[in-house]
Curated annotation (Swiss-Prot):
Keyword Magnesium: no
InterPro entries according to UniProt: Growth_transcription_reg, TMF_DNA-bd, TMF_TATA-bd
Compartments (UniProt record): Golgi apparatus
Descriptive protein name: Protein SGM1
Amino acid sequence: MSKKLSLEERLSLATKKGRKKNKRSTSNLSSPSPVVLSNNEQESARTSIDDAAAGVVSIDNAENIDDPAVRSESTVEGDTGKADSIAVDDVVHPDHNRTDCFDDTMVSLPTWLPKNYTEFTVEELVKEISPEYLRLNKQIDDLTNELNRKSQIETTDSSFFKLIKEKDDLIDQLRKEGAKLAETELRQSNQIKALRTKVKDLEYEVSELNDSSAQSVENYNELQSLYHNIQGQLAEATNKLKDADKQKESLETLEKNIKEKDDLITILQQSLDNMRTLLEKEKSEFQTEKKALQEATVDQVTTLETKLEQLRIELDSSTQNLDAKSNRDFVDDQQSYEEKQHASFQYNRLKEQLESSKANWDSIEYALNTKIVNLENRFESTMKEKNDIEEKYQTALRSSETLGKQLEKEKENHSKAVLEVKDLERRAETLKSSLQSISDDYNLLKKKYEIQRSQLEQKENELKPHQENSNEKIIDKIPVELTDSLNSMEGNIEDEWTLPQENSMLSLSMSKLGELESDPSLKPIYNESHETICSEESQHFDRKNVDFSIDDIPEEAAALQAIREGESMNSLNNTSIPYRRASVQLSNSNGHISAHLVNKLSTELKRLEGELSASKELYDNLLKEKTKANDEILRLLEENDKFNEVNKQKDDLLKRVEQMQSKLETSLQLLGEKTEQVEELENDVSDLKEMMHQQVQQMVEMQGKMR
């Protein structure tokens, strides 16, 4: 046949074949034999069912043409379907030629076939045909029973026994192919279950990564706000540091001035000590001179008094002599009178000088005594002030010692803080190394996963053509298996898609799941869109009604081949497993589902990998910014401590400067007062010397005149 016939043509040809065979059987036999009629009816029913099944396959292929992945395979499956159907027809009708089957007239479709059967899916069409299918099955059972009854009579027909043997061989072959198909379906379903469990694990890990990324984002926002606050504090601290630098410069200038003034104070103290010594020397000299002058004055006064007494005596004697001689000579009286007047005048003059000198000496003595008392009082006050200054100086030294101790304590605290910072840096380095090891483990896991995925895709691509060819063969050979399959059908057709649980690969998948869960190299993979992925995947898997786990995927291709060989051996050993003929359609749908799921899983995994890389980069950036912020915080804390120390030192220096300024002012006041006192004393001493010199000169002159 050059072209593939449609379902209507196949059904019409099947009805024609049945009519022709009925006519031939009635013409050859003299009496109508029920055995021949039953054989012809059986063959016509089988051919009609064969054509119906081929039509169903053609409809399924027409529906699958819309899928681009199946479009290329459908042509090959159609050709193989043609060849298999021709082979089955040749086996069933070895004595008839194919050219007799064609006729120009077209026969209408059977009444039990719905008119809009082309719009139905495979499952709906099977549900519609199933009652007629059961009826035909009953007819076939009745015919087979009659055939078995008549087979004892017609033992001479060798071609009939050959046909039965060939059909038995076909049944055995179809059973083997069905067992293989069940094994492949079971393997693929287990793989899909493994992939699904793996996807669920990945989604759980993605949710955990979303939570951790959200927490890291919150930490990052907090660090940013803290960083901005610290930047503001840093700006304020820099301004304060600038002010502190200016104040430090002013303090340095003040310290220089203080040092200069300290030097001046020491020099002035030395000069003051020298002046004190000179003052004491001059005071002692003054007292000695005073004593000498007092003694000299006393001597002079005594001498003057003696002289005055002598002059009185002489005057009395002279007066007596004058009175005695008054009578002698008048001229002599006049001369003596002049002499007496001159002597009395000198006497009065000397007496006045003596009284004035006494008054002067009394005033000088009083002034000197008052000055001496004042100087002694001032000296005592200066000594008291000196003691007070020394006490203040001692207190300042003690305060400086306490400040030095506090400075040492602050230095120790600073060294401890530096050690803590170093410990924190070491911890940060260890965390970085652990993060690097985790990233390396993740990269290794990613490479393993890529290898496993590539191996899985390769094996899927290898399994697809074999699966499609086996499906076509089974579909073309369904009529041979109808008797056995319909006897095993019970209840609803949808409940017969599953295989027995004792022959599944659950133990193998659980063992592989335990091995992969105990693998330490597996790390969680994170994603941001966990809820959307869960909803999409749950809808998809609920719609397709498929469970799978990625834990069943081995790490190497050799392990995968070993698992498949083990599965095939288990399936061959368990040849007595009852399987369902409706698994043909399920294999096709599962093939498309597995290909669709593999494509979707690959796209989802690529998206997850991209989001994982982005989240990893974000996490690395956050870690870098966190370390920078921590370093900045530590630096700002150190600068803040330094600034506080500088403020304390500034306050201490200001206090010391104020104290030194007050001391300088008091010392300068004392120096000024003492210099004034020294100048006054020098002036007084010079005045006394001049007065004493004048008095001595006057006394010398008076003595010269008296002589």
